[in-house]
Regions:
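A general structural signal for alpha-helical elements within enzymatic catalytic domains
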Residues: 27-30, 71-75
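Short S/T/G/P-rich N-terminal loop/turn motif that feeds into the first structured element of a domain
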Residues: 1-66, 85-92
Length: 92
């Protein structure tokens, strides 16, 4: 199983909009994960957010669905800079 992490900085004046849209995104992506996706904020900078996706069986299908969902829910409107996506797998 694989895990994916998306991180970015939000416009603090749009935090409420960002939370609503990202929560919709996480709900849409839950079917691709064995664990519920989560939205986190950095401890020392609450404008830096991270989405965690754990237990991804098919990373290619997940990535395509995530890109579609990001566009569907307009999840770049409130981001300052770029949205970064990283993938990890457990060591064997």
């Amino acid at each position: 199983m694989k895990c994916a992490y998306a991180y970015y900085r939000i416009d603090p004046e749009q935090a409420s909009l960002a939370a609503t849209r990202i929560d919709l995104l996480l709900n849409a992506m839950a079917t691709y994960c064995s664990q519920p996706p989560r939205r986190l904020a950095r401890c020392d900078d609450p404008t830096t957010w991270m989405e965690t996706y754990e237990g991804i069986a098919d990373l290619t299908t997940f990535s395509v669905a995530l890109n579609v969902a990001v566009q569907t829910y307009n999840c770049t409107e409130f981001i300052q800079g770029e949205r970064h996506l990283e993938c990890f797998s457990a060591n064997k």
